[in-house]
Structures are given as structure tokens and as C-alpha cells.
Amino acid sequence: MRYVVFDTETPNRCNDRISQIGFCVVEDGIMGPERCFLVNPECSFDEFNIMLTGIRPELCRCEPDFAELWRRELEEVFSEGVLVAHNAPFDMAVLAKCLRAYGLRWKHIASYIDTVRLARRAFPTLSNHRLDTLAYRLGLELEHHDAGSDAAACAHILLACVERGAAPEDFLRGYDMRAMRTLRLANI
């Protein structure tokens, strides 16, 4: 199976724009290179998000907006695999809101897997299943809240869960990109 493991960072609490997006492809158990892009969100930044991510407005000012980046770098890759993210409902909602904000049409239903749920199966004795906790447990370097680093860590977590016997297909969900909600398996 082909997985597109991704992470988003947002400039403010609205979570309808992206200031950074990172991804890597995992196919047949092999992780491809991490890709990461700053994005001009064309909106204001909240101080909280700046402190969390380190991404300031001036870093994004000359970067492409989401629509340009989507067409140039993301749409083809994201269309050819199951999306995977850590706390995926958040990232799926951000992606759906961004597509809507820019008037971009994509799939109505996108398949996804949440590695938080997968990790709970593979690592049941951990006190929590946050990205930084799992990265530490697996000995991964993590620049938390850098979308590329978070996506790469998520990909390693996906592979570690598979090694421990967790089946990603058991955690497959659908996300209605128009209604912005997770669907039960029977509705996919």
C-alpha cells in the first residue's frame, strides 16, 4: 500500500490556512525522502502559533500560496495514496479548509489513517501517544512543530507500528472533504 504521511502547521487559531506543510511517501514498507514547504497563508499570524512553530510572517511572505503549491507539488502526490497523519482529524480538517478557502476541488472522500489510534494498538503501555513521546520511545530526532520533521517522525511511527503487528488497514477511515468530518467505514 502507498501512504502519504503529512503534517501541517497553521498561522493562527482559525486553522483554515497553512504556513508549512511536510510529507513523505511510504510505499511497500520503504520511506521516501521528506519534503517540506513554507506557504504564504495570506492571513494574519497569532503570536501563539509563532511561538509554537517558530514560523514568522516574514518567512512566508515570498513563498507560494497554498493554491500554487497544491497544483505544483501536492495534488498529484496526495491523490495517489492513503493519507496518514498524527492526530489526523486535525490535519485532514486543515487540508479541507484550505482547499475550500482557495476554491480548489479535490476528492470528495479521502482515505486516511491516524497514527495516534494505530500507536495505541502497537504501544498499549505508553502513558500517552503524543508525537514527541513516540519519537522519544523510538529514538527519533524530532524538531516538533516543524512539518517536515513531524511528517518524517509520523512515517517512522507508522513503520514501527507495522513491525509490532498493528495493521494500518484496520484503522482506515474516510474524510468527507466537503462536510469536513470523518466517516464510518460503512460510509466510505
Language-model segments: what does each one mean?
Residues 146-160:
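Acidic, divalent-metal-coordinating active-site segment for phosphoryl/phosphodiester hydrolysis
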Residues 95, 118, 154-158:
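Buried hydrophobic packing segments
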Residues 62, 85, 120, 179-183, ...:
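Short, surface-exposed loop/turn motifs that are enriched in glycine and acidic residues
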Residues 113-124:
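Short, flexible loop segments at boundaries between secondary-structure elements
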Residues 1-110, 124-145:
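Conserved non-catalytic scaffold segment of RNase H-like nuclease domains
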Residues 111-114, 172-173:
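Beta-strand segments within the central parallel beta-sheet cores of soluble alpha/beta enzyme folds
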Residues 68, 117, 151-153:
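Short secondary-structure boundary/hinge segments and terminal tails
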Residues 157-188:
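Acidic two-metal-ion nuclease catalytic site recognized across multiple nuclease folds
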